[in-house]
């Protein structure tokens, strides 16, 4: 919800949608022993004109999350992906690569404004946790997404990380203001701008 408000504050657009890509842990539907990532994504989309205050958006976000992250929706997406992979496995790589580049260039990560990934509460054995000051994880930056945000909580400290390709600080500043307004004690750490 705060990301929608910060996203609106960070854009000059007056129309269109803010869309946040949220990973869904597929292990809750298909138990797996692997430590490899097993997730799919759903998109929570709200028109910019409807992003006004937190209470008015909570019901809409919950409704979309419930519908789009449901087992039925994830199975449908997984089945579609599997069918596409099975169909494309017979197409030569020399044909697939240029087509994939064109499709990614046309859509790519432009269909989402931001990404949010939450590892949740991480617990460690006391023999290890006493040596850990804090914990974080950072998503890689995307070519066009405004920001990739990640959250992890360890030892009652929640770390919210933002990775992005732009130097415009309006998204982070709005997130800071919103958290402060909610009475959350915020400590900000950052890295210097990296220019290639």
Language-model segment annotations:
Residues 8-196:
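Acyl-thioester-dependent acyl-group transfer interface
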Residues 4-5:
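Membrane-embedded hairpin module used as a gating/binding unit in multi-pass transport
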């Amino acid at each position: 919800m705060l990301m929608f408000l910060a996203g609106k504050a960070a854009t000059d657009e007056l129309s269109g949608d803010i869309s946040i890509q949220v990973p869904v842990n597929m292990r809750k539907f298909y138990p797996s022993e692997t430590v490899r990532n097993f997730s799919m994504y759903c998109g929570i989309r709200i028109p910019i004109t409807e992003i006004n205050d937190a209470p008015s958006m909570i019901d809409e976000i919950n409704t979309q999350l419930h519908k789009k992250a449901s087992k039925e929706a994830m199975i449908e997406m997984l089945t579609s992906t599997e069918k596409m992979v099975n169909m494309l496995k017979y197409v030569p790589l020399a044909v697939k690569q240029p087509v994939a580049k064109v499709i990614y260039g046309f859509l790519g990560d432009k269909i989402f404004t931001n990404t949010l990934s939450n590892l949740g509460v991480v617990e460690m054995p006391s023999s290890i946790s006493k040596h850990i000051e804090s914990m974080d994880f950072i998503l890689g930056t995307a070519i066009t997404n405004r920001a990739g945000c990640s959250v992890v909580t360890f030892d009652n400290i929640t770390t919210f990380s933002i990775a992005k390709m732009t130097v415009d600080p309006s998204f982070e500043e709005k997130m800071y203001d919103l958290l402060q307004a909610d009475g959350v004690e915020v400590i900000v750490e950052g890295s210097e701008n990296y220019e290639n």
